[in-house]
Amino acid sequence: MLAVIFFVLTQFTGMREDLFLALAQINALVAEGEWWRIFTPILLHDGIMHILFNMWALWVLGPQIERGVGTWPFVGVYLASAAVGGAFAYVFGSPQDVAVGASGAIFGLFGVWLNWAVRRRNTVQGQMLLRQIGFLLLLNAALPFLIPNIAWEAHLGGLIAGFVIGEMWSRTKDERARVAVTIAVAGLAVATVLIL
């Protein structure tokens, strides 16, 4: 919902430039210590198709994860995946890169689903889910070759974070422990950015 509000503000008010300067992941500013910029790009989207795709993916992927693990772990995986995606975009991207969007967070949700599919691969449902998720991931892997300025590093980082968090969640049913896992993963992303 916040992303939609910020999209309206950037598209229909004179605040676009100010909000992008304040919240976009500008790697040169991350290098100067503005580590929070690995989180804040999830509030910004560069165009109607960008936000529509991300909000559609959130709507499709999110509710079952939230029902399965609880609201706070879901919020945690979303933010932790955004942070790891941002850290990947910082570490593997160019110092001149500027990134906006929630794709790292969305790919974290793909990562959780991929983990669930891999864990259930010996069932018919798991095999079908694995094929569906695999197809969507292959399609998304091709996008950077077709559409310029896609932060594939953020996609990859988010996917890995979501998969790892999903694996760690499978080891506990305790909601507080699941939240702690997401905080630890986000903390590692921040520490990586601060160290490098």
Predicted regions and their residues:
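A detector for small-residue-rich transmembrane helices and their helix-helix packing motifs
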Residues: 1-196
